[in-house]
Amino acid sequence: MGVFAKGDVVIASLSYSDFSRRKRRPALVVATPKGLDPVLCLITSKMRGDEYDVLIKKTDFATGGLRRNSNARPCHLFSLDPRVIDYKAGTLKPEKIKEVTAKIVEMVT
C-alpha cells in the first residue's frame, strides 16, 4: 500500500487470534522501525474496560477518522507487512498518540 507513520490509523484484513477467519479491522501504527514492518495496535469498537484501553473519539483525529468511537488496545501489539494494509483511515492528533504510547510503556514496565 505505501509508507505509514506513527499515528496513522489503517484498515487491514486481520486474522482472529485462533486463525479461524479474517476480518477487516482498524489498527494504529505505533512504531515504524527502519527496514522492518510497522508495529500496530489493535483498535476495536467494543468497550471492554481493560485498564490499558485508550478511548479514540472522532475528535481525536487530525485527519480522516473512524465511523464510531473506538478503543486502542495496547495489549494487542503486532507487526504487519504493509502490503496487506488496505488503506489509511486517518491520523490521530499528537496528544492522543502520546496517550497510547504512554499506555504501552506503562504496560511493559
Predicted regions, residues:
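C-terminal terminal-subdomain/extension
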Residues: 64-109
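Short consensus segments that form the blades of beta-propeller domains
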Residues: 18-20
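Compact nucleic-acid interaction/catalytic patches
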Residues: 22-23, 29-62
